[in-house]
Amino acid sequence: MPRVRIAVGCHPHNAKFYDDGLEADLRRMLKDPRVAALGEIGLDYHYDFSPRDDQREAFRRQLRLAKEAGLPVVLHLREAHDEALAIMREEGFPEAGTLLHCFNLDWATLEPWVEEGCYVAFGGALTFKNADDTREAAARVPADRLLTETDAPYMTPEPMRGMTCLPDHVLFTAE
């Protein structure tokens, strides 16, 4: 499958396992030409499956790796957008780009990220009845920075909600 590309990284849920050995494995994987990005990386303060200090450290180290490798990052952020933005500004945004994965908040949260030139992906949550703020945010993202995604098997869009999300459901989100 020559057109398939992958992203590799240590998700914030697993940040407690990030160590020099894991980083060495990532460095090795980043040399594979099929790797297109480093991700999902970031901060998830909703579940706190890993201690926040571990999440911050893994996030910073992986940002540095992405910049060294000249690769974009795919960010998983939950209840931590302001802190993640501060870290990104301290560490520097990768020249290759930054993608906010599955954004589902409001324009006030998103605007500084867009000002930094980030790409923004919206998943099925964009179609939920209570997502007016997210739809407004999506409408304000420049077209050249706007993406849709499924986050399958999660966040199934209307009208398929309640079922397992599948890749072809991205059409409902895009509409």
Predicted regions and their residues:
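Mid-domain alpha/beta scaffold segments of enzyme catalytic cores
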Residues: 1-175
